[in-house]
Curated annotation (Swiss-Prot):
It is a single-pass membrane protein. Induction: Cotranscribed with ptxABCDE. Activated by the two-component regulatory system BvgS/BvgA. Keywords: Cell membrane, Membrane, Transmembrane, Transmembrane helix, Transport. The chain crosses the membrane at residues 30-50. This is Type IV secretion system protein PtlB. It is found in: Cell membrane. Belongs to the virB3 family. Component of the type IV secretion system ptl required for secretion of assembled pertussis toxin (PTX) through the outer membrane. The keyword Membrane applies. Its main location: membrane. GO terms for cellular component: plasma membrane. The lineage of its organism: Bacteria, Pseudomonadati, Pseudomonadota, Betaproteobacteria, Burkholderiales. InterPro entries: T4SS_VirB3/TrbD/AvhB. The keyword Transferase does not apply.
Length: 104
């Protein structure tokens, strides 16, 4: 193998056994709910942490896969989706071409 892939380099940064980015989003949301409505919302943090740790137990990239699913299925609404009810993923962006008028 010419260019080996070291699996340790692909692991996300973990805090309390959960990837740092989903943990920050979840704890920030719970903190905002606790500030806006009631301090009792802070009791949801251990429950959310436990749920995230259970999800991560099998695959440490689970939250990345969930984000990709949401981004590709629900957030990516292109022109083909309205007509074909499907989504196309391509590395190229196609622009409409102008028609050239032929001179007689």
């Amino acid at each position: 193998m010419r260019d080996p892939l070291f699996k340790g380099c692909t692991r996300p940064a973990m805090l309390m056994g959960v990837p740092a980015t989903p943990l920050a989003v979840c704890s920030g949301t719970i903190a905002l709910l606790g500030i806006w409505f009631s301090i009792a919302f802070l009791a949801l943090f251990p429950v959310a942490l436990l749920a995230m740790r259970i999800m991560i137990r099998r695959d440490d990239q689970q939250f990345r896969l969930i984000w990709l699913y949401l981004r590709m299925r629900w957030l990516s609404r292109d022109r083909t989706h309205a007509f074909w009810q499907s989504t196309v993923y391509a590395p190229l962006r196609y622009a409409e071409r102008r028609r050239r008028l032929r001179k007689p």
